[in-house]
Every structure is written in structure tokens, then in C-alpha cells.
Amino acid sequence: MLQAFDEGNSHAWGNIEYDEDPWVFNASRPYFVTAGLQNRHLSLWASHGRYWDAERGWKWQRPNLFCTTEDLFTQTIVVPYLIPMLENAGAIVFTPRERDWQQQEIVVDNDDRRSIAYQEFVNGKKWKNCDSLGFANLQASYQDGENPFQMGTVRQAKATRRKKNSLVSYQPNFQKEGKYAVYVSYQTLPKSVPDAKYIVYHKGQATEFTVNQRMGGGTWVYLGTFEFDKGCNEFNRVVCTNHASRRGVVTTDAVRFGGGMGNIERGGFVSGLPRCLEGARYYAQWAGAPYSVYGGRKGKNDYADDINTRSMMTNWLGGGSVYMPAIDGKRVPIELSLALHSDAGYNPDGQSTWGALAICTTDFNDGMLNSGISRFASKDFAKALRDNLVEDMTNTFGSFGKRYLWDRNYSETRLPEVPSA
């Protein structure tokens, strides 16, 4: 990844490279990215978000300014612009805050015995429960430390290369027509396949994905955002099949449509806001992360926990990959992380631009990242990011300030085990 901005850089990944199947691949894309960011896995997040304060209840982390707050403003940069730009260049982008602004949420799961939205079809290999725990949405809200991905079961079937295959259909009843993010879940087993097949039917159109189930099991895995019709029919659903190119097993658990409302209870109350407006701490719990990822302060300081959760989620997913080989995790090959802040700042004249600041941390863990490469890779990345941004903004809009390149002790650049800024 870093070679993209500095060929031959001695601080970059060198011969460390992930060259196997990506976590998620859109097989229906009308073009194939052959260079750029193809199959690069990145972690990117917008700053802050609503959090629980023990004395003042649910509140924003940053003050109101220009009729908004940084907790809201940075989402309007990252979600509609930055993430799609990177995805269109071929990247697989993880973000530790909910990315979907849709307030509706529908979860279809095999553990909901009353639902007709979940159906299994056997055409050869049979579906059965696997030994691992899975997702179940058994309650309207969750207390601190409760993990919905430890409350249910997971289904599995032997994979087949034949056209004759079994499938599971997830067909929700949409109360409103609109755009909904689609998240799937599964479990990673020793014999999991690298290309489990999913088909998203949206307003009658079919978009096909392959998901590498050898990584990232036991959490929500984002496929894309699609337009769905109101109601319940086979033209608006998700199908998981046991078709794969290699021998092994396909697992399938719940499928989630829409970002939804916050459902993590703190101090006896949920936030009452869409999940996308909350901090990463609460999304991490809904996404099945262990308490050590988001609850380092044991429920006593959500503000500090939220700051650390963004990086800890990245490490939890990336642990065990070629880029973070020495820590346990989900083996997703995340190789770069970026936190975007607006700093809620302005010039004293209230008119001119304040400019760009980039931050990195090199003085930590003897100056090394988990893979053994130098933390100066983060400094190279931060400098290139700031310099290119200033150049682009100046060329497009006129003068744009170049502030500082800070090498300081900040959580979001200290904790990630990959180059970060």
C-alpha cells in the first residue's frame, strides 16, 4: 500500500504482501480493478460520536460549531465521499462506526423461530448447526458487556463446485422503500472456503459477491448498500449458497439490513439516536467484539474507551494476518488505518481556511509495528497525506494552509498495529 505513494521507501512493507482472496469481492462489478487499491484492506473512520457520560448522560464529544458538531460533520466526509472513492479504486474498507444512515434495521436469523423470513433449501448438501456460537437478537437492548454474537447458532453445509447447490434465503419485510446497507455474518472454521457465494436481490436486480470465510467470522461483514422495495418478496432479499471453487464448508448466520437505531444501554438508557451517530464503542459491541476491545475502562469511562475502540477494532480484525502476525484476531489483512478529524477549528477572522494537520506516533513499542517494520512508515504516510491534500486543495480552491506534521502520542496513531495517521 505504502509503495503507492513512495516507491522504494525503506520504511514500507517490503516483501510483506497479502496475495490471496479478498475479504469481500463484488463479482458483478462491470469492471475489474487490476491495479490501484485492488484487494487492499483499509481501516478508516470518522471522528467521535455520541457517547455516555456518567454525570451528564448521552452527549456529543465535541462542541457545537457552525450549526453542527465534529461528531456529525466528519461522517459527511467519510461516508458519502472518502469510503466510496477508495472502494471504487478496489479497496475493501472497514469502518468501526456504523456507516449506514438508514434508521430502519431488519435482522433475519435462523435463531428467530417465529420468522418466515429465514428459509433453507437443500439441493444436495444439507444444512446443519456447527459447533461455534453465533448471532441471535434476543433482546431489544444490550447491557454493557453482553455479546449478541455469543447468543445464537450458526448453520453450515459442505461446499460444492456443482451447479446443484443448497441455499439459505434471507427475505425481510421492508416497512419502507429505500437504501439499506447489507451486512452478512458467518463463522470461520478450519475448513472454511475462501469464496462463499452471496447474492443480493435488490428491486429485482442481482448483485453477486464472494466472501472469504477463512477470515472475519463472528461479526458483521459489509457487502454494500442497495435500493429495496417496500414489502416482502423474493426480488428483495439475500441468498447464501454452498457453492465455492474449493472443498470445505460454508457457514451462514444472520443477515442485517440497514444501520438502525442505537441499542446499547448505558446508565439505564439507549441514546435514542441512529446507530451511525454513536461512537465506535457501541458499534463494536453490536458487532460481536470482545469486551477487551471496547471496555478497557470497565464501563467507567466511555469517552476514553471510544477513542481506543477505533484502533482496537482494527487490531482485532487484523490480528493473525500477514500484517499483524503476532496477535490473535480475525486474520483480515488490514494494512493501513486513517482517522479523519475536523478539529472543530476556525481562523480568528472566521473566513480563511485553517489548513491541514497530520499526526503519527513513532515513539512506541521500540519504534516497531507488529509485523516488525518501522513505525516511521506512519510518518511517511502522514506526511504524504498532508502534503498531497494541501497541494490538491490549493490547486482547486486557492491557498490552503499547511499546518504541522506532529509525531506525538495519540491513541489513534499509537494503538494501530499497521501504519496509521
Segments (PLM) and residue ranges:
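Non-catalytic propeptide/linker segments at domain boundaries
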Residues: 1-48, 52-61, 245, 252-273
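Short, solvent-exposed loop/turn and secondary-structure capping segments
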Residues: 54-58, 193-195, 348-352
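A solvent-exposed, charged loop/short amphipathic helix patch at secondary-structure junctions
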Residues: 55-73, 356-369
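Short catalytic helix/loop segments, enriched in acidic residues and glycine
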Residues: 65-84, 277-278
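Active-site-proximal helix/loop segments of hydrolytic enzymes
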Residues: 80, 89-164, 170-173, 187-191, ...
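A short tyrosine-centered beta-strand micro-motif
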Residues: 178-184
